[in-house]
Amino acid sequence: MDELKNIIRDIPDFPKKGIVFKDITTLLADAKSFQRMVDLLAHRYVGEKIDKVVGVEARGFILGAALAYKLGAGVVLVRKPGKLPSETFSKTYQLEYGTDSLEIHTDAIRKGEKVLIADDVLATGGTMSAVVEMVRDLGGEIVECCFLAELDFLGGRKKLPDGKVFSLLTF
């Protein structure tokens, strides 16, 4: 995993002073690293009979679509308000500096479907806990929440359900 970890670059003071941003675009741009990441994550879920992979805006779309392709599943997008064209279900959640909202199509997940939720980085867990609630409210059965990377020191894993969390890399 070190070869994947080492290709991710740190961007100091982004998006604001005092934050060290983990920039995964370097990994995405390297074909062999991107393939390895997708293969390693997909291998974990082979045999799980995943029906849908939920990708969280925006980098989660990349990971979610690639995993869905490998697993023979459909892709569901969770987006910021006003970006999805049909009827949506919305969830507002707390941030350390206010609130934010996400939306999903109301017909994107059927009751009992097995769902894998994918995003690039697990930080505080606020966004992902909202997505988990949305999927459950639509009747989806969550197999796991998977991430390319986890910022362990922020404790986001504690906000997520039943230990159903997997991160390929931990910082």
From Swiss-Prot:
Domain of life of the source: Bacteria
Q: Which organism is it from?
A: Geobacter metallireducens (strain ATCC 53774 / DSM 7210 / GS-15)
The record's section on InterPro entries has: Ade_phspho_trans, PRibTrfase_dom, PRTase-like, UPRTase/APRTase
Q: Which GO terms describe its molecular function?
A: adenine binding; adenine phosphoribosyltransferase activity; AMP binding
Recorded catalytic activity of this chain's protein: AMP + diphosphate = 5-phospho-alpha-D-ribose 1-diphosphate + adenine
- Subunit details for this protein? Homodimer.
Matching entries from NCBIfam families are given as: apt (TIGR01090), PRK02304.1-3 (NF002634), PRK02304.1-5 (NF002636)
What SUPFAM superfamilies does the record point to? PRTase-like
GO terms, biological process: adenine salvage; AMP salvage; purine ribonucleoside salvage
Q: Which GO terms describe its cellular component?
A: cytoplasm
Q: What is its main location?
A: cytoplasm
Similarity remark:
Belongs to the purine/pyrimidine phosphoribosyltransferase family.
- Kindly indicate whether the keyword Transferase belongs to this entry: yes
Q: What does this protein do?
A: Catalyzes a salvage reaction resulting in the formation of AMP, that is energically less costly than de novo synthesis.
Q: Which UniProt keywords apply?
A: Cytoplasm, Glycosyltransferase, Purine salvage, Transferase
- List the gene name: apt
Q: Name the PANTHER family on file.
A: ADENINE PHOSPHORIBOSYLTRANSFERASE
Q: Where in the cell is it found?
A: Cytoplasm
Q: What is this protein's record name?
A: Adenine phosphoribosyltransferase
Q: In which pathway does it act?
A: Purine metabolism; AMP biosynthesis via salvage pathway; AMP from adenine: step 1/1
**A matching Pfam family:** Pribosyltran
Q: Which cysteines are joined by disulfide bonds?
A: none
EC identifiers of the protein: 2.4.2.7
| Entries under HAMAP family matching the protein | Aden_phosphoribosyltr (MF_00004)
